[in-house]
Amino acid sequence: MRTSTPSSTMTKSGSAPPALRARSLSKSYRSPVLDNLDLDIEQGQFVAIMGPSGSGKSTLLHCLSGMDRPSGGSVLLGDTEITSLSEKELAALRLTHFGFVFQQAHLMPTLCLLDNIVLPGYLAGLRPRPEITARGRRLMERMGISEQAASGVTEVSGGQLQRAGICRALINDPGIVFADEPTGALNSATALQILDLLGQVHASGTTLVMVTHDARVAARADRVLVLVDGCIAEDLALGEYEEARAAQRLSAVSEALQRRSV
């Protein structure tokens, strides 16, 4: 059973509130990276984040997911303002409510694939260990890597490592999965397979927030945010577009915005 959102409530109409809300979200390092963003992400939505290099894509994902703290503003998960949580509370929330898929899986080299996958489940302590292990095996079967359960990290391909990374992200049945360029280090054929698997994750009801530079990847999303200079320059709903037409539209928008930002 999916872990419930902290302090989540239903609206008066009976519909669920947004999965994530950002209000006046800002982030600065030596200079501003995110500039006073407001954003609602609905439950079950697949949101892709695009934009030129340095536009704030990964920073936005990190602030939304609690991996980095904003310089100003707030992020709410249900009714819980995660930006006000302590580091310990935030770490527990990330472990139990969020899943993460990165460009590189970053698995522990001393553990086999199955042990890497179930470790976050053991740490969360939400279920008995035998149940967590059984879930890990089911996820590996679902991702097509069940035969590699006992294999070491150096004994499998990059695509198999990324599949294991997806399994690890799902071990605690998170409500939201954050993905940062999950296909960026893969060849075209393997990248398509990984996208199909992430599409299945989204189809099961999981909210998916993905950073990508590739219009063909973003074209699979329900909604695409295009960032320029830390601001949302475009917020596109793609539901009415076929995937090929969506990719063409996104490519045109992205190219125009990149020219504008130069």
PLM region spans:
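Conserved ABC transporter NBD signature motif
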Residues: 73-81
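Conserved ABC ATPase signature
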Residues: 152-156, 160-162
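Conserved signature/switch motifs of ABC ATPase nucleotide-binding domains
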Residues: 95, 151-154, 172, 204
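Short coil-to-helix segment of the ABC ATPase nucleotide-binding domain corresponding to the Q-loop/switch region
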Residues: 111-120
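Helix-to-loop junction immediately C-terminal to a conserved catalytic motif
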Residues: 65
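The feature captures the beta-strand-to-loop junction immediately N-terminal to the Walker
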Residues: 50-52
